Amino acid sequence: MASSSAPRFRVYSKYLFLTYPECTLEPQYALDSLRTLLNKYEPLYIAAVRELHEDGSPHLHVLVQNKLRASITNPNALNLRMDTSPFSIFHPNIQAAKDCNQVRDYITKEVDSDVNTAEWGTFVAVSTPGRKDRDADMKQIIESSSSREEFLSMVCNRFPFEWSIRLKDFEYTARHLFPDPVATYTPEFPTESLICHETIESWKNEHLYSESPGRHKSIYICGPTRTGKTSWARSLGTHNYYNSLVDFTTYDVNAKYNIIDDIPFKFTPNWKCFVGAQRDFTVNPKYGKRKVIRGGIPCIILVNPDEDWLKDMTPEQSDYMYSNTVVHYMYEGETFINYSFASGEDVTASQ
């Protein structure tokens, strides 16, 4: 008994390419027999060609073009028999002819006489879009579309089959061509209303606002909540801000620095690349494709005492941290808020 998991045979096409190995039938006889077997699909053209292999055994190749699409689910449906010997059965390999022009050229390439060839009907030259045409069409879509929606609509109209099975890939391309605009951060407080410890000020001037021939150092700030850490860090310029999780799909290549805010050490991917201001590192976003991050910019890491990274690090990780960052633990009463500037206003700083 055949296994139920065996693949089901089916050929569904207007155009068929048949090969009968070791077939001694005359091409004209095979052609006439196939016209009868395929009559319900309204054949338009049939070419049957006998080919002698090096060992002298004859093979029969047949190209069939039908008006209607043939649905063949029985691999024995096109078996042929000899009139003189009904027990001699010739079984074909049945395939869809994806390119009729190529198949016709292939089966007639070495025919040495009309005796080995039989044709009936008028050959239908089926034009199939070449790779160059498809590339040109896709290039035109990319260059002329002005939004994600327009790009996807044009792809759907031009490549409906590919669109139906590769929609996720086309959506990824659309997001790459037309990314979401980077939101401009508006500081919660004027820069003049924020202050920082001299150690932090020194780091800012040396590693954030000046060029360095080597790699910049990052800064690690551990301190209580609601002391203005985040407000100060986000007021320094264009940056990538990550809170709760690191999402590389929103990475801005024009940012001057990164901020990692309230993310536990164990949940910070590529932490060495961030801390060490490394260049050209590869990331693998959970819901996106791998991408190369240009990097080379310092990072501000902000944590509260209950999630102190250094407490969770091995000695080797701690050594890397101290070698690549300025570590600052806020002292009691330290704040980034300049209360004298606030002049008695009700100031509530984040973080």
Curated annotation (Swiss-Prot):
Chain ranges for the short sequence motif RCR-2 as given in the UniProt record: 59-61
Cofactor annotation remark: Divalent metal cations, possibly Mg(2+) or Mn(2+).
Pfam families, per the entry: Gemini_AL1, Gemini_AL1_M
PROSITE patterns to which the protein is assigned, alphabetical: CRESS_DNA_REP (PS52020)
Motif residue range(s): Nuclear localization signal: 286-296
Motif (RCR-3): 106-109
Biological processes annotated in GO: DNA replication; rolling circle single-stranded viral DNA replication
EC number: 2.7.7.-, 3.1.21.-
Positions annotated to bind a divalent metal cation: 51, 59, 61, 110
Name recorded for this polypeptide: Replication-associated protein
